Curated annotation (Swiss-Prot):
CDD domains assigned: M20_DapE_proteobac (cd03891)
Protein name: Succinyl-diaminopimelate desuccinylase
PANTHER family with a match to the protein in the record: ACETYLORNITHINE DEACETYLASE, N-ACETYL-L-CITRULLINE DEACETYLASE
Listed GO biological process terms: diaminopimelate biosynthetic process; L-arginine biosynthetic process; lysine biosynthetic process via diaminopimelate
Entry keyword annotation includes Magnesium: no
UniProt GO molecular function: acetylornithine deacetylase activity; cobalt ion binding; succinyl-diaminopimelate desuccinylase activity; zinc ion binding
InterPro entries given in the database record: ArgE/DapE_CS, Bact_exopeptidase_dim_dom, DapE_proteobac, Peptidase_M20, Peptidase_M20_dimer, Peptidase_M20A
Gene from which the chain derives: dapE
Organism: Burkholderia vietnamiensis (strain G4 / LMG 22486)
Amino acid sequence: MSATLALTEQLIARASVTPDDQHCQQIMTERLAALGFECETIASHGVTNLWAVKRGTAGRDGKLLAFAGHTDVVPTGPLEQWTSPPFIPAHRDGKLYGRGAADMKTSLAAFIVASEEFVAAHPDHRGAIAFLITSDEEGPATDGTVKVVELLDARGEQLDYCIVGEPTSSAELGDVVKNGRRGSMSGELIVKGVQGHIAYPHLAKNPIHLLAPALAELAAEQWDAGNEYFPPTTWQVSNLRAGTGATNVIPGHADLMFNFRFSTASTVEGLQARVHAILDKHGLDYTLKWSVSGLPFLTPRGELSNALEHAIRAETGVTTELSTTGGTSDGRFIARICPQVIEFGPPNGSIHKIDEHIELRFVDPLKNVYRRVLEQLIA
């Protein structure tokens, strides 16, 4: 069994359902400390975070490449639906099964073993290697990577490159990597009316009727045209509630929840202003609460993307597509202190599902790609 596969199975065997790390980071810390990494545990409200760094011969003048990821996994769902227990690694049909196999314990193991092989081959490497690991990525993500980034920023620590081990690939290892992500902003809208008997509408004010024209306009609005890297911004309703359940009562208020997925072509302030303008134009009496869970980030083509594309092609023969599709990730936090952030990991077809798995043929090539990037950028 390869070193990467053995470590992957060791991590999968830890039932680290978010935010419980289940000592996964302790396993990683022991391996990193043996390589000469300075390891720091940063705990926050039940969340375990790890910051580990190994400087090269250039000290702080050398380029720093960070590997970022998460030890937490999503809940298993009904155990009886799993073919084999989710926290007992199992091999079937050329695949490794277990919760976290794809998202993202194989990436974590590949980070570690790639670093071990790199340091053994390049003991006098010039640049620095770092690890930023959290147990709060699959949950609220309020005490994980964002807290470590805030701490590093306060210390004046800047990263040059960061690879986030998210499962970005589609059919083959390396066919898709993420060089950016859209931002996410949600709104909770309450439109006020006047409750009354449905037979006497002149004595009431129906908030559903009042909201409907504004809702139609919001749904039809083109928020931007996107750009070279991002599709156009989208606005979608996630929840709409009104009424008491009775058939003869006009409701007193209508509640709407919606979400923007927005690109670098729009700003938080600009989108908020346009929503308020539409609501105000329709004369609504309303309250609107905003929450921004992530800003968009983008890494244009450069040293990191070139190194990663070259490493993937050399290892797998696959031509890589740079993409910004999908949901948010911790890359949105890291981008605050790192100009080049790219996500790359195994295929994502089984993530968060029953019988999550990774094809065994991808395990060592994933490690090799990470090692090749280290060799290109910080040797």
